[in-house]
Amino acid sequence: MIEVGDLKKGMFIIYDGEIYRVLEASKHFMGRGSGLVRTKLKNVKTGLVREVNFPSGEKVPEAELSFRKAQYLYRDGDHYYFMTLDDYEQHALSEEEIGDAKYYLVENMEVDLVFHEGVPIGVELPTTVELTVVETEPSFKGDTVSGGGKPAVLETGLKITVPYFIETGDKIKVDTRTGEYVGRA
């Protein structure tokens, strides 16, 4: 058990019988009485984010997880297949368990598989991934005057905003935490 005041970004806890990753945790004190710990939690299985306020002093169970290096192999229907690099064993995760990570997975990519009690429950992506632009509007002289960017569709189906100089077929780096353009690959 861990006290909610000690929660830090990146920790895993069990709340309502589900495993959550702590995205944010901040302490708020009232004028009188005890304070609150406001958290933003992401469900590891479904990817849904929820905000939860805990009274300070409350304790929550910490999830016992293990991480193993794996390679993304392929997608078949609504299942994604991975091979752990230490024992070459294959594991399948459903689209629900993968969540938004599906927009960043490219075949043969190395990721960390998240295991709980020996069963894979999710995937941890690298901070940035390289993806190819498959569809975007052509650039015209004078586009950059207004600033901003233009919409683009990437090889995984992810839709993001990219600078005007990016063309169809370009490889770009995308931040997996925010889904934003980082730079050219």
Swiss-Prot record:
Database matches in SUPFAM superfamilies: Nucleic acid-binding proteins, Translation proteins SH3-like domain
InterPro entries, alphabetized: Elong-fact-P_C, NA-bd_OB-fold, Rib_uL2_dom2, Transl_elong_fac_P/YeiP, Transl_elong_KOW-like, Transl_elong_P/YeiP_cen, Transl_elong_P/YeiP_CS, Transl_elongation_fac_P
Gene3D superfamilies noted in UniProt: 2.30.30.30, Nucleic acid-binding proteins
Intracellular or extracellular location(s): Cytoplasm
Chief localisation class: cytoplasm
GO BP: peptide biosynthetic process
Keyword Protein biosynthesis among UniProt keywords: yes
SMART domains listed in its UniProt record: EFP (SM01185), Elong-fact-P_C (SM00841)
GO MF annotation, one: translation elongation factor activity
Function: Involved in peptide bond synthesis. Stimulates efficient translation and peptide-bond synthesis on native or reconstituted 70S ribosomes in vitro. Probably functions indirectly by altering the affinity of the ribosome for aminoacyl-tRNA, thus increasing their reactivity as acceptors for peptidyl transferase.
Protein name as catalogued: Elongation factor P
Gene that this sequence comes from: efp
